[in-house]
């Protein structure tokens, strides 16, 4: 499965003055995927604690600071 390399490259061009190598773009994308996976896993646990079957926005909001702190660079 491929990922949107052009979109990531465009994002970095808009927000940074430097270009990135292809391997750096790969690492950024993998870190992003790991972040989303962790966020959804913790939100799912939070939903189970409250007895919900689906993950609601409030479950994500309640754990977002914890996950963001883990991924702070």
UniProtKB/Swiss-Prot annotation:
Complex formation: Component of the inner kinetochore constitutive centromere-associated network (CCAN) (also known as central kinetochore Sim4 complex in fission yeast), which is composed of at least cnl2, cnp3, cnp20, fta1, fta2, fta3, fta4, fta6, fta7, mal2, mhf1, mhf2, mis6, mis15, mis17, sim4 and wip1.
PANTHER family: CENTROMERE PROTEIN W (PTHR34832:SF1)
Deletion phenotype: Severely perturbed cell division. Aberrant cell-wall deposits accumulate during septation alongside a range of mitotic defects including errors in chromosome segregation and spindle formation. Slow growth at 25 degrees and inviable at 32 degrees.
GO molecular function: protein heterodimerization activity
Keyword set includes Nucleus: yes
UniProt subcellular location: Nucleus; Chromosome, Centromere, Kinetochore
UniProt keyword terms in alphabetical order: Centromere, Chromosome, Kinetochore, Nucleus
Pfam family, one: CBFD_NFYB_HMF
Predominant location: nucleus
Residue ranges of domain Histone-fold in the record: 1-67
Record gene name: wip1
GO biological process: chromosome segregation; kinetochore assembly; mitotic cell cycle; mitotic sister chromatid segregation
Full protein name: Inner kinetochore subunit wip1
InterPro entries assigned to the protein according to its UniProt record, in alphabetical order: CBFA_NFYB_domain (IPR003958), CENP-W/WIP1 (IPR052484), Histone-fold (IPR009072)
């Amino acid at each position: 499965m491929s990922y949107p390399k052009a979109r990531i490259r465009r994002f970095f061009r808009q927000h940074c003055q430097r270009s990135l190598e292809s391997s750096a773009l790969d690492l950024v994308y993998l870190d992003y995927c790991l972040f989303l996976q962790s966020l959804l896993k913790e939100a799912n646990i939070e939903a189970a604690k409250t007895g919900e079957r689906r993950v609601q926005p409030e479950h994500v909001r309640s754990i977002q600071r914890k996950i963001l702190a883990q991924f702070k660079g």
